[in-house]
Amino acid sequence: MLKKDLLGIKDLTREEILEILDLAFEMKKLLNGEKYSQALRGKTVVTIFFEPSTRTRLSFEMAAKYLGAHYGNIEVATSSVVKGESLIDTIRTVERMKADVIVTRHNMSGTPHLLAKYTNASIINGGDGINEHPTQALLDMMTIKEKKGDFKGLKVAIIGDIMHSRVARSNIWGLKKLGAEVKVAGPSTLMPPQIEKMGVKVCYNAEEAIKDADVVMGLRIQLERQKSGLFPSIEEYREYFGINEERMRLAKSDAILMHPGPINRNVEVTSGAANASYSVIEEQITNGVAVRMALLKILCERRN
């Protein structure tokens, strides 16, 4: 049973993941129907993002409002943090304003775990450094479950900058707990050392990873990595690891294509592949709202 906070997929049991997904499907029914509920009336959700985010922050805002909660967002660029206030003081200040749930994103791994120790409010990790992005993995797993049903024996290929991807880490933790087989592929300079210890198979070309896959997941390449020399050029990355229609034909005939967004089109994924019938990238966005509604509901009810 999910406790006070959601800090990472690594901390969750298989049963906890499935509990969240089951409720997320119920929340999606609400989204597709009446849309608005008063389930969290009187509750307050606050987002504090120390890194840029449009999708995740807006998704949490919509999730809170659809459930009838009050919502607030702290703009870090104009907040007291810029004036020297510590992270812990900021979190305590927000708690004193009677926030029930605080969603935070920070470029330093482990920040949500630290903050959770200093507040009675529930902390949701909206992404911490290169460590984890649990809500993205949950919406990805929801999308896979929706399309494929069972995870046991499912073959998933994750392609891109594995080393710097918190999305990859959270997905690997979750997919392995649910019984999927995971392959990862990317340039050797973007592959973490000893990642095999997470139970994945490492491939150094896209074709090997995609062959016979049920799910193909591209990761966003941060273009600044190329400037720092971690891979030679965008063109070379696209040639060897870009997901296109030809490579997707190596996957199973009913395979699905995923991407956490935003996509660098014609770098990680071609427009042809992203717009194809097997692409579920837009459905991931809707499922993101449903998953975050489920998490807010679970954590607020635990607080009661």
Swiss-Prot record:
Annotated residues for binding of carbamoyl phosphate: 55-56, 105, 133, 136, 261-262
Gene Ontology process terms (BP): 'de novo' pyrimidine nucleobase biosynthetic process; 'de novo' UMP biosynthetic process; amino acid metabolic process
Binding site for L-aspartate: 83, 166, 220
PROSITE patterns per record: CARBAMOYLTRANSFERASE (PS00097)
Catalytic activity: carbamoyl phosphate + L-aspartate = N-carbamoyl-L-aspartate + phosphate + H(+)
GO cellular component: cytosol
GO molecular function per UniProt: amino acid binding; aspartate carbamoyltransferase activity
Pathway the protein acts in: Pyrimidine metabolism; UMP biosynthesis via de novo pathway; (S)-dihydroorotate from bicarbonate: step 2/3
Keywords: Pyrimidine biosynthesis, Transferase
Protein family (similarity comment): Belongs to the aspartate/ornithine carbamoyltransferase superfamily. ATCase family.
Role this protein plays: Catalyzes the condensation of carbamoyl phosphate and aspartate to form carbamoyl aspartate and inorganic phosphate, the committed step in the de novo pyrimidine nucleotide biosynthesis pathway.
NCBIfam families assigned to the protein according to its UniProt record, in alphabetical order: asp_carb_tr (TIGR00670), PRK00856.1 (NF002032)
Subunit (UniProt): Heterododecamer (2C3:3R2) of six catalytic PyrB chains organized as two trimers (C3), and six regulatory PyrI chains organized as three dimers (R2).
Protein name: Aspartate carbamoyltransferase catalytic subunit
Organism encoding this protein: Caldanaerobacter subterraneus subsp. tengcongensis (strain DSM 15242 / JCM 11007 / NBRC 100824 / MB4)
